[in-house]
């Protein structure tokens, strides 16, 4: 399938083409015949010709879609983890939503949701302890949406919802980016997050409970970790690497004002 407009829209910003910044970091430059090509066409040509390694590009997409552009965050406390603590507990659900794949895989370029199959898992990464129990699992959901591109005109697109489960801390986080020009209410961020939570419950037996007032200290610590995730784990393209100290100070400044949704 290759690079799609939907993937580009979830990574690039109007002020920065992060995909082409990455390509320059890989020492890839347009040839004279490639001048004027849009990003999508150029990347797919690079992939087809072998000048851009697909696994390398997939890793870039993993990082960007998991940590970049994710402004809305939900934090949950896990209940009975014993129901889904082994990789085998996840096999059936992963295979259902990832076209037959399970455990560790990445197929962001090869899988896109559609109206018939509106939810796909395009990336999964599991970390286990010596007893083969899961310590951490990361899953990236791709959700079919439509955006408005004019009066009564709509375009098929995709929103990515990263989910991370920390079994040691009994914590689950879900992140999302507020897309603009969403065509219908059921494609908006909160509706997508609710739907993914329902899938996790029904297909993976994930159960969560609300954080109460007695969990304020825990939530504060979680908030610090989430801010570090959001601002320190973005791929370090040159200028970002130089901002580490500034970002650290910024995290401290906003810790009391950032609106996190603790359900």
Regions found by a protein language model. Name each.
Residues 1-163, 182-189, 206-251:
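Intrinsically disordered, low-complexity polar/charged tails and linkers
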Residues 169-171:
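Short hydrophobic/glycine-rich mini-motifs in sensory/regulatory modules
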Residues 177:
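Conserved NTP-donor binding/palm subdomain of two-metal-ion nucleotidyltransferases/polymerases, i.e.
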Residues 184-201:
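Acidic (Asp/Glu-rich), glycine- and aromatic
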Residues 249-259:
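Long, contiguous domain-sized segments
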Residues 261-263:
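Conserved small/polar residues in nucleotide/adenosyl-binding loops
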